[in-house]
């Protein structure tokens, strides 16, 4: 009985993975560090639904987003995430561009180090312009382009790993 369902299940999982990989793509990943109580600002010009994933690797960095303010902070923002660890914010396609992005180093951490990943959802009907999307107005990390082929390869490895466990 098990073999009867394993092929359709694998095909369904593969199609689900393929859909997610083709509709969403990592635009850039970069690292940075920021002192307690300080902000690093970025500007997002790219159209479409964009998800920002801020992973604090040391200390605690928080994310503030605004469609109206170029330098959002903890009092002036439209979207924010201030959790300990991973902060995720999805910017709707309807938000006016340019978007102001602020990364705050939490006051309880003398130095916060972070990795920011920018993911675009091509399923929302956005333009196919693949130019760089940001400009740093203070300190920032070095951006790295992520290849679609690399993302597919990593996804396949994740599926194989999940099946083996």
Curated annotation (Swiss-Prot):
Residues 1-23 form the signal peptide. InterPro entries: UPF0669 (IPR031420). The keyword DNA-binding does not apply. The keyword Secreted applies. Transmembrane segments: none annotated. GO terms for cellular component: extracellular region. Keywords: Glycoprotein, Secreted, Signal. Glycans are attached at residue 38. It is found in: Secreted. Belongs to the UPF0669 family. This is UPF0669 protein v1g209471. It comes from Nematostella vectensis (Starlet sea anemone).
